[in-house]
Amino acid sequence: MRIKKFLKKLFRLLGYKIEKIHPDIHELTFDEIYPKFLKNPVIFDVGANEGQSIERFKKIFVNFEIHCFEPNYSLYQKLKKKYENNKNIFVNNLAVSKEIGEGVLNITQKSGSSSMLDIKKNTKWLKVRSKQFNTDPDNFIKKKEKVSTVSLNDYCKTHDIKEVDILKIDTQGFEDKVLIGSSEMIKNQSIKFIELEIIQKEAYENNFSFYDLEK
């Protein structure tokens, strides 16, 4: 509850109100909006996975700087190798959280479902995902990996980054911790766009939901 109140208060202080978009209202995609306002953006890709968003941003912008964060060491190694000749792409083997420290990453059969949160048992989501990979729900988590964590406030201070044009977050229910760790940047209006990918299904223990902000 404290996290929910903090986030609502934080966005109110900045003059924003969070609510659902009416289904009848046409909305532009991020990819349509970004080029209208940004030319040489600094982008943070939190939850880089296999580099899907990196490739997407490469198609939108000619000149850019991307700092991507991927706690899964195996995926990090692949990203590091894939973009080793791109001087404007910085790959970090870190989990973004509310503070510097350590945590445990639950690595699942489907890499995109891996999370810093525990997976809820006996849910429809888990049964469906397990079936897709021909495994038992109890074995959907392949292994647990100890990871280093960082807050974006600290990362920006360490790397002398004054502004972030796009903050993309896809952390499987861990988004609130990322936002709390970005609070100074947000309060100083140093982040222009925040792109959140939020899971709405019951999947993780204490996962962040858009509905939390509406309550």
Segments the model singles out, each with a brief description of its role:
Residues M1-K215:
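Phosphate/nucleotide-binding beta-alpha loop and adjacent structural elements of enzyme active sites
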